[in-house]
Amino acid sequence: MITLITWEHESSKPEVREFETVAACYNLAANGGFYKAQIVNEVGVVDYEF
C-alpha cells in the first residue's frame, strides 16, 4: 500500500489516505491543491513531496 499524507494549509492536521497504486496517489497529490503532500512507500520512506 502507498500512503498519501496531505496538509490543507500550513497549520492544519495531516490527513492520511492509502492507495493501491503510486499513479493514483501521485495524481491526487500533484493536482489536489494541497499546501503540502507526501507520498510514502511501504517501508516508510518519502518518495515524493509536493
Regions found by a protein language model. Give the residues of each.
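A short beta-strand micro-motif
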Residues: 2-9
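A short, exposed loop/beta-hairpin motif centered on an aromatic-Gly-Thr core
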Residues: 11-23, 46
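Short, surface-exposed linear segments at secondary-structure transitions and domain or protein termini
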Residues: 22-33
